[in-house]
Amino acid sequence: PIFLACEIENTNYMDMAMSLSRPHPHYPNSETGVKLGDEQFARDWNWDERGIYALVGMGIEPGLSDVFAKYADEELFSRIDEITVLDGSNIVIEGYEFAPSFSIWTTIEECLNPPLIWEDGRGWYTTEPFSGIQTFDFPEGIGPVQCVNVEHEEVVLIPQKVDAKKVSFKYGLGAEFITILKTIHLLGMDRKESVDVQGISVSPRDLLAASLPDPATLGSRMKGKTCAGTLVKGLDKSGNPRAVYLYNVV
């Protein structure tokens, strides 16, 4: 990986995401295995000794969403009870009955892995995919979207820098997309491990991704808006209840 190559060559590194997770081998829907970023954080000692820097999780989500959480902590709240990163859109892609606007490979990884949650006094734990259903009314005309718990880097990063009682990430998939993802899992098409197809080794997930339109080519067909933001609940600087959604809309 480029991350390790930079470490070996004493080169600074920046990434928009973090190293992948691996579910707990026996209790995937309740206990953490290898969390997002664990493999990179485990190398911190060597980067420190070499005097080089790696900035990971620095995109919009994660990245800007984490900055929103820290801003709320320092400028808006005296106590934070809950931080929920909420992502939703009303984007449609003209000419396609089904065409994800984001990498289906990554979407499967995020949405079918056990969602990660952090709570004060309990730490990190996992739950079942598509749990915690919540309809959130997104701003700037996007409107209400059905959101569910999803594994995401913010739940690893925010508790390390912000004192909150609970941190979670919810993705606005909508009922139709949730059904599609459940069907993909039921058919085994989410598997990364290769299977033999008439003498050819093929990963079902890679095959699925190759069968769908490349999101990078769909920009001119996309209509609507997408929103990434951080919902913070707690007490303001005067001790009064407050809830704020800090967001970015494209």
Regions found by a protein language model. Name each.
Residues K35, E39-N90:
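Adenosine-phosphate binding glycine-rich loop
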Residues H26, D66-F68, E94-A99:
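Short acidic, glycine/serine/threonine-rich loops at helix termini
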Residues M14-D15, V56:
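Hydrophobic residues in well-ordered beta-strands that form the structural core
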Residues F3-E9, M16-I52:
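Rossmann-fold NAD(P)-binding glycine/threonine-rich loop
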Residues T11, W47-A54, A243-V250:
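Glycine/charged-rich beta-loop-alpha catalytic/anionic-binding loops adjacent to active sites
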Residues E31, L55-I60, G141-C147:
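Flexible, glycine/proline-enriched loop segments at strand-loop-helix junctions
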Residues E74-V250:
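C-terminal catalytic/substrate-binding lobe primarily of soluble NAD(P)-dependent oxidoreductases
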